[in-house]
């Protein structure tokens, strides 16, 4: 499966998370996943909450439209974004 897949108006992202980074950003491809750096530490779900908030802002959707489908406790995650209003250029160039 590729890093970014469009499915019935939603986006499925296969991401690799880098917690405790110096800034929040979508880095680019990391193998067959999209690498996302976030500033939050991987403690008590803080990284997941921060990731959801960051992706919601990047894709211009409410936080409730960002779902972590797989990988709740690991760095490799699958995320569904429901009908994104905006697709960042780092992601749109990876769309099939």
UniProtKB/Swiss-Prot annotation:
A Pfam family assignment: DUF167
SMART domains in alphabetical order: DUF167
A GO cellular component entry from the record: cytoplasm
Membership in a protein family: Belongs to the UPF0235 family.
PANTHER family attached to this UniProt entry: UPF0235 PROTEIN C15ORF40
Name listed for the protein in its UniProt record: UPF0235 protein Sputcn32_2690
Annotated organism of origin: Shewanella putrefaciens (strain CN-32 / ATCC BAA-453)
